[in-house]
């Protein structure tokens, strides 16, 4: 039916919004990156150990996981008539690895084997709010530093402007954010 990517900095409410969308929309298949497949599990384990000293390695691992994730999980569910909603996709690599110094061209090239989603939505929140949410849920990972989140947010907003992605104010109540996202998805699904 349709493939939707929900993007945004850590602490922007992606997981919460997606779980609300599962209740609001019919035939939703929710997934996330890193995936639950072997490469995704490797990435999660790798991140716990501090990741690579070179962000290009992280970008390559995420791209490999994304290809596998798309082919094994996303594409088949779309063909089965689901609205597949992924928490993170290519824009996460552009934003996060970009903020770590990897060129946008490199990230796009290594992700060229997977298609763009039918709709990419950016959940935007001030990094200080995001950081407070992250601390509230129990800590921070490698990429979850305030100055880093600011860089990532800047890249997301620049990409939204370049690509015409809708940007949703995620500082509001999760139910309000989910209602706005659901309306955007309904518009895309209706015209497919």
Swiss-Prot record:
It comes from the Archaea. It is an enzyme of class 2 (transferase). Transmembrane segments: none annotated. Signal peptide: none annotated. It comes from Pyrobaculum aerophilum (strain ATCC 51768 / DSM 7523 / JCM 9630 / CIP 104966 / NBRC 100827 / IM2). Coiled coil: none annotated. One of its GO terms (cellular component) is cytoplasm. CDD domains: TMPK. This is Probable thymidylate kinase. The gene is tmk. Its EC number is 2.7.4.9. GO terms for biological process: dTDP biosynthetic process; dTTP biosynthetic process; dUDP biosynthetic process. It catalyses: dTMP + ATP = dTDP + ADP.
């Amino acid at each position: 039916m349709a493939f939707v990517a929900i993007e945004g900095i850590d602490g922007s409410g992606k997981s919460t919004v997606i779980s609300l969308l599962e209740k609001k929309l019919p035939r939703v298949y929710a997934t996330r990156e890193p995936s639950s497949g072997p490469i995704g599990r490797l990435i999660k384990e790798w991140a716990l150990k501090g990741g690579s000293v070179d962000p290009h390695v992280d970008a390559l691992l995420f791209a490999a996981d994304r290809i596998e994730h798309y082919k094994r999980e996303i594409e088949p569910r779309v063909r089965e008539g689901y609205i597949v909603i992924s928490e993170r996709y290519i824009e996460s690599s552009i934003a996060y690895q970009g903020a770590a110094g990897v060129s946008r061209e490199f990230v796009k090239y290594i992700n060229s084997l997977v298609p763009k989603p039918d709709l990419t939505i950016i959940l935007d929140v001030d990094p200080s709010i995001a950081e407070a949410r992250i601390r509230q849920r129990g800590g921070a990972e490698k990429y979850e530093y305030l100055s880093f989140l600011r860089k990532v947010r800047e890249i997301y907003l620049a990409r939204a402007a370049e690509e015409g992605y809708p940007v949703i104010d995620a500082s509001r109540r999760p139910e309000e954010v989910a209602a706005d996202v659901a309306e955007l998805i309904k518009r895309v699904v209706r015209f497919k």
